[in-house]
Amino acid sequence: GRGLAAALMLGADGVLVGTRFYATQEAAGHAAAKERIVAASGDRTIRGILFDIARRNVWPAPYGGRVLRNEFSERWRGREAELLQHQAEEASRYDRARTAGDFDTAAVIAGEGVDMISDIPPAAEVVTRMVKEATTLLAGASNRYQVSEN
């Protein structure tokens, strides 16, 4: 709610909350991945193409995903060219890890806002909480600051 209120106060029309909705009961993600999101902090995220290489799905240069750091990322970070040389074997290993719920190897896609996630509620509850907190904060801000026409 705080992030939504802040963004709206700065003139945004909305916010991106993908990680928050990934850690909900209805999301199709693996339960172990959701638990990692709850336990994570924003400084444990990295941005790059390592997991795109492992998934055989490399995006154009300006695009890269943010994921939670894990053993795979620590092993290959800064060695993307070498990973490309081993892509077939690492992709196979990655696929097995993802199927098995092994998130020491498979990616957990998560943004820096992961710090604010502490539970895995129903999605409707996330929306209700977010709207309630944003509404309260926005109402409080309008009461706190009076604009003078002078």
What are the roles of these predicted feature ranges?
Residues 2-150:
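Conserved active-site-proximal phosphate/metal-binding subdomains
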